[in-house]
């Protein structure tokens, strides 16, 4: 029954949101109460307390923004705005925007592209969302050599974007589930590094609406996510 199924989805969604918000709310409340009660008047400790509150509030804000984006895409409230744009220029901009965060974690992002320009036909804003979520996911799970490689290749009329990060492979049994909302392969690590299990579900929603391929491949020394774009000349 469709009504029963929708109620189950709604209940599961609310349960997941409540679970995700519980930890940051508890941390914010605990550290705010500590500041109010004057547990420490040491400036360094007070600065640390304030830092935790700001970080956790930022995580909640980020999660709410992603949920709103996902809701708009899944329920068809946002139409694709198709246009021709340079995917190399877009990726260069996104990589530059993420270099500071990556370097703070000792991670190097490499985007060594031979082609200076590759035009694609898509919704530039949505594709920016896809690339950003892939790179964010790579930063959150990068390990071992601490390296992320972004590359673009032409495959017939399509253009494929790859985002590879060194680190642990995704267990094969988890791969079909990683595109689901709130799904986390390594819950302890995800909490530590700031993931919320929503980014890849946004990728899936966008690529499904666009009708192009996307996926993930385990490599010998890491994991590679990819997606395809229309590279045919359009007027």
Residue ranges and their predicted role:
Residues 75-80, 119-122:
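Conserved micro-motifs of the catalytic ATP-binding
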Residues 81-85, 103, 108-118:
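Conserved catalytic submotifs in the C-terminal HATPase_c
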Residues 211-217:
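Glycine-rich ATP-binding loops of the HATPase_c
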Residues 170-184:
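Short conserved segment of the HATPase_c
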Residues 55-63:
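Short alpha-helical segment of the dimerization/phosphotransfer core of two-component systems
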Residues 145-157:
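Short beta-strand/loop element within the Bergerat-fold HATPase_c
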Residues 138-139:
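Short helix-loop "hinge" at the ATP-lid/N-box region of the Bergerat-fold HATPase_c
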């Amino acid at each position: 029954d469709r009504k029963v199924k929708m109620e189950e989805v709604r209940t599961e969604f609310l349960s997941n949101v409540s679970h995700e918000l519980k930890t940051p709310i508890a941390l914010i409340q605990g550290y705010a109460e500590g500041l109010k009660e004057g547990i420490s008047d040491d400036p360094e400790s007070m600065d640390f307390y304030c830092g935790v509150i700001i970080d956790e509030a930022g995580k909640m804000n980020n999660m709410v923004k992603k949920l709103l984006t996902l809701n708009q895409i899944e329920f068809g409230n946002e139409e694709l705005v198709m246009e021709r744009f340079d995917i190399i220029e877009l990726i260069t901009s996104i990589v530059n925007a993420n270099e500071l965060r990556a370097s703070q974690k000792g991670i190097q992002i490499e985007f060594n592209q031979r082609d200076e320009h590759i035009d694609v036909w898509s919704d530039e804003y949505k594709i920016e969302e896809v690339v950003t979520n892939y790179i964010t996911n790579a930063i959150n799970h990068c390990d071992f050599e601490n390296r992320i490689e972004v590359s673009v290749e032409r495959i017939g009329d399509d253009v494929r974007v790859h985002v590879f990060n060194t680190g642990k492979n995704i267990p094969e049994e988890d791969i079909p589930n990683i595109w689901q909302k709130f799904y986390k392969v390594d819950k302890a690590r995800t909490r530590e590094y700031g993931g919320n299990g929503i980014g890849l579900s946004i990728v899936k929603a966008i690529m499904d609406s666009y009708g192009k391929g996307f996926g993930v491949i385990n490599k010998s020394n890491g994991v590679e996510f990819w997606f395809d774009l229309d590279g045919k000349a359009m007027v």
